[in-house]
Amino acid sequence: MTIRSSMKNNAELESKSVLANESNIISTFTRRIIKEKSGNYQVLKRSLDGKLIYPEATGISSNRGNKLLQRSEVVTRRDLNNSKPMIEQTVFYNGSEHRLLQTNIVTDSRRKRIKFTPDINVEPVLVGDENDIDGSEKEDENITDEYYGEEDDDDLSKLVNVKEILTPILSLGDIINHKTISRTFSSPILKNLALQIILMIEKEQMSVVRYSQFLEVFLGDHPEPIYESNLNLPSYNHNLTLPEDRGASDEDDINNKNNINEVNSNSLSTEAGHINNGMEEFGEEDPFFALPRLEQSNALLSLLPSSSGSASISTLTAAEQQQLNEEIESARQLSQIALQRNKEFIRNLQKIRKSVIKANRIRGRILNWSREYLGISDDDITIPVALRVVKRGLISATTNKTTNFEEEIENTMEDGVVDDNEPDEEANRA
């Protein structure tokens, strides 16, 4: 009995140890998986079957037609020309990599810390053992100050001047003197946007040309340019040589005619049937009034797959021919819809560009008015006093400024009269 009981105890202990080991293995495996999957990565964009992973959207100018690419949502209205590669900074912690959502700007290897100004009237109330906590916090502050160097903390109320931002405009001079407003009116962002929009319009116009050529293939036209050699026109003597020069150029004409006859014999051999039919119908046709004889383009047949090419179309069954015709019709409809959408997109871009240019023109006029109001000369151009007074009067008439403007006009007019009289006195003396 003792042997059997000891064997049972050993078996139970071994089973417990095995279960413990299995539970440890499972727990470590789950922790490992959780650590590897805990990174805040975005889900990759894949195809419907999940086999194809779309590439990254690097070097694209717009997300039109590129929305399936990775990180295509980063392309914003503010930065249309996104030619820079989108490389994200990552940090490794907790067993996996994480994307950095925000980076702190470090200057002179020192870290700036922001503290909120506490209310002076409110005194802190200590409860329990908060004295020890304050002591430990002071020690931590000393450690951080020693580590980051002796630098004063930045006060949040001093970093942002709310009063300066929310102060209304009293005159046109505030557009130049007010820092926040002058930064807005002197920014070239509207000009850059207009330039980027016109570049996008040119790019979309090229795609419109390609779609148009593709539709011409479905209509049976020639998508490529048509040259004189493809028109199959009969030979015609234009009589461009003078009678005096004919004798000197007879030998050259004979040689050229021989070469031309050789070329025409090769090219017109395949067209003899068409020409004979035309001659039978219309009789003798003047080569000067002859119409070009163009054959139907074979560009559509070249686009078909090899199994259903021009040589084997006749061997297809009725079901295969019907399926092929449906595919051709669907491709034509889709290309026509794409062409219409592309033209509509170009029209919308043109409207947007007109609005942006108009806003930029108004911004420039307001900025120039404010410069003239303050008497700031552009490019060393001096404005006469009388003209300056008239302009300031017109500008002030359209604004709400009512402060001692008449006195300023009188003073400037007196100065202007004195300045204008000086040259006359010198002229009288002379």
From Swiss-Prot:
Primary gene name: RXT2
GO-annotated biological processes: conjugation with cellular fusion; invasive growth in response to glucose limitation; negative regulation of rDNA heterochromatin formation; negative regulation of silent mating-type cassette heterochromatin formation; negative regulation of transcription by RNA polymerase II; nucleosome assembly; positive regulation of invasive growth in response to glucose limitation; regulation of transcription by RNA polymerase II
Location within or outside the cell: Nucleus
GO cellular component: cytosol; nucleus; Rpd3L complex; Rpd3L-Expanded complex
Region (Disordered): 408-430
Major localisation: nucleus
Other remarks on this protein: Present with 1630 molecules/cell in log phase SD medium.
Protein name: Transcriptional regulatory protein RXT2
Source organism of this protein record: Saccharomyces cerevisiae (strain ATCC 204508 / S288c)
